[in-house]
């Protein structure tokens, strides 16, 4: 009898894979094992929970039991996999073990917390579980410090501000979204955040946190300090690679996979935020959706390489939303920026005047799909 496919993880990547497998094969045994409850929720909603006044349980879209029944699955929630015996094709928890024919690691990524004194006082919002643990503190907080001015930090800063909280956003860089685009392109959103009342501390560094009788004292560089009620780390994600490393798989920034989503072991695959696909870490929904479609075919013997088109990344800042695509972080691009009252179109071109990247905002986001077609793949 076939041992089937074992998937470690229950997030967006794992669920997309299950749905794609079941479209092609209703009977192959599928086992999912994860450390959380395995209830389904939409992770991007975490950027808007405070202004929407949502509790953690409000985010649940489908319970684990409903998921198992709908897709004919064996589920093992609240279960930590401790070890993979790749030679024996076995995964092990503290009290159990499972045989597999093919194994998929969909272990996601964890929030990076800066290693400063008092780091244990920082909260993270990388999962429903993490939000559940701190939702009362965040709801009650009047003054919030967000560490990191990237995509998630900018989304959270706007959301907390819209909820009426006093928000400070700190980042080492000279502009927000610095790893995604140059300052002349992000300045429109930066100006909007400032207009809304977000206090931006750019080119600034958090040096430590300390609990006080009236809140949390954040010590900054240049002999500055501020007192707040909550501190959120939004300083990026780190792919979860510990289990893959223990299994002897090749690891770089993430679990290394090829165009077939195959790791350095022929019967182990990886998908989602934990992966590095041919040298690229792509923690966005669209590449995960496309990867899940391809991996489902490969697990069922229809070998198909992953080919990723130019893809949109959406920054969900409702007062000034942005869509971007292409190599927006390239230093050698020349930016042509057209700003009107209804929005901005910024085109990044190379020395040959070839469009390599673009950023569009507000009502001009409808121009994104036309621009997307002109980007080289």
Curated annotation (Swiss-Prot):
Q: Do the record's keywords include Transcription?
A: no
Q: What is its main location?
A: cytoplasm
Q: Pathway of this protein?
A: Nitrogen metabolism; nitric oxide reduction
- Give the matching InterPro entries: FAD-bd_OxRdtase (IPR050260), FAD/NAD-bd_sf (IPR036188), FAD/NAD-binding_dom (IPR023753), NO_rdtase_NorW (IPR023961), Rbx-bd (IPR041364)
Q: Which UniProt keywords apply?
A: Cytoplasm, FAD, Flavoprotein, NAD, Oxidoreductase
Q: What does this gene product do?
A: One of at least two accessory proteins for anaerobic nitric oxide (NO) reductase. Reduces the rubredoxin moiety of NO reductase.
Q: Which GO terms describe its molecular function?
A: oxidoreductase activity, acting on iron-sulfur proteins as donors, NAD or NADP as acceptor
Q: Recall the taxonomic lineage recorded for the source organism.
A: Bacteria, Pseudomonadati, Pseudomonadota, Gammaproteobacteria, Enterobacterales
What's the protein here called? Nitric oxide reductase FlRd-NAD(+) reductase
- NCBIfam families, per the entry: PRK04965.1
Domain of life, source organism: Bacteria
EC number annotated for this UniProt entry: 1.18.1.-
Query: Which HAMAP family did the record assign?
Result: NorW
Keyword field contains Transmembrane helix: no
Q: Which reaction does it catalyse?
A: 2 reduced [nitric oxide reductase rubredoxin domain] + NAD(+) + H(+) = 2 oxidized [nitric oxide reductase rubredoxin domain] + NADH
Q: Which family does it belong to?
A: Belongs to the FAD-dependent oxidoreductase family.
Localisation:
Cytoplasm
What cellular-component terms does GO give this entry? cytoplasm
Q: Which cofactors, by name? A: FAD
